[in-house]
């Protein structure tokens, strides 16, 4: 019990003394049309790459109506990021870029798509935490018959608003 208490106190001290002004890596969760894990790396001061893997839920709108979109998806996002404002313990950055989406839907159908990404990120300057909010419109192709309601393969437009929280290091 004493070792656990000592470890907890040490972690608390480490977390409260780490400054998150500038970070290279971050790891956390993102939620929007689906939910998943997100890893972000700052390649340069203004270029960032997000890698996301998670569960996709909801619908994709296509020319025949709506395709069920329950499945797994892997997003690779490349974005330009720049400082918007700083003060009161928060550093705001905005970012804009593109994404490549690869995954599968219920019934075994595959999906591949491209899209745009635009958002804002708030970095806590006194704690190693970052929050993000973004909008992601996209276009994708369903690669096989979904087997649901007779809807076959086709193209689909989708969009999502996403909220993320990450530990920065």
Cite the ranges covered by each PLM segment.
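Cleavable N-terminal export/targeting peptides
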Residues: 1-23
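Short N-terminal segments immediately surrounding and downstream of signal-peptide cleavage
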Residues: 22-38
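Extracellular loop and loop/strand-boundary signature of outer-membrane beta-barrel proteins
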Residues: 24, 61-63, 147-151
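Transmembrane beta-strands of outer-membrane beta-barrel pores
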Residues: 31-35, 53-59, 100-106, 137-143, ...
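Gram-negative (and chloroplast) outer-membrane scaffold detector with strong preference
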Residues: 41-131
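Outer-membrane beta-barrel "beta-signal"
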Residues: 74, 156-169
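Flexible, surface-exposed loop regions and adjacent strand-edge segments
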Residues: 113, 148-156
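Internal, hydrophobic beta-strand segments that form the core of beta-sheet-rich folds
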Residues: 133-135
